[in-house]
Curated annotation (Swiss-Prot):
It comes from Manihot esculenta. InterPro entries: ATP_syn_F0_a_bact/chloroplast, ATP_synth_F0_asu, ATP_synth_F0_asu_AS, F0_ATP_A_sf. One of its GO terms (cellular component) is chloroplast thylakoid membrane. The keyword Oxidoreductase does not apply. This is ATP synthase subunit a, chloroplastic. Key component of the proton channel; it plays a direct role in the translocation of protons across the membrane. Signal peptide: none annotated. Keywords: ATP synthesis, CF(0), Chloroplast, Hydrogen ion transport, Ion transport, Membrane, Plastid, Thylakoid, Transmembrane, Transmembrane helix, Transport. It is a multi-pass membrane protein. It comes from the Eukaryota. Gene3D superfamilies: ATP synthase, F0 complex, subunit A.
Amino acid sequence: MNVLSCSINTLTLRGLYDISGVEVGQHFYWKIGGFQVHAQVLITSWVVIAILLGSAIVAVRNPQTIPTGGQNFFEYVLEFIRDVSKTQIGEEYGPWVPFIGTMFLFIFVSNWAGALLPWKIIQLPHGELAAPTNDINTTVALALLTSIAYFYAGLSKKGLGYFSKYIQPTPILLPINILEDFTKPLSLSFRLFGNILADELVVVVLVSLVPSVVPIPVMFLGLFTSGIQALIFATLAAAYIGESMEGHH
């Protein structure tokens, strides 16, 4: 019994030491000109883009009138993105389908790649590879692109009259309406970053403590929530664009 108790205590302490070694925010930098960029984010982003482009090329290289296989899957995804865009934007959704689709697919594949691909096999001088959406710089960039998109949508439809929304329904709300333009990208970026980072940290901690079958259900739950986060981001992006074009809250 004493030997068994000592073994359990040793395993528990080893798990706790492993948890204490989990590092967050370690980056491998490239120097480009006078700037430092997060190399691991660029590497994993290129991998995600390659997966998307490669899958699309393979799926539609021989398009058929009656779609099958990969073509059928991509057409289903396109219909899904069109439905989301039309629901949130309205009848003028057409030009925005590529933007909403790009956001959804990039985030979805990034999240799943972080959960499924064995990034830790690739050793870096500092830090480690992870999902692109596990880095706050990526999520902030996606949120800023969304902000630029809905500003462009509003200005292209209403011209300078777009700015009248800041004093509607009363000029008293001007500060709040201006603040809203800052809170939208903040909420988009931190929601996505926080959920993906938390999911990966939970899996790492569980694997350190119980490296058997216990973390597997959590990993499947992470895959589900990763897809939901991609859908939430794309839906909110489309809703913001539709709101800027229609001028209602």
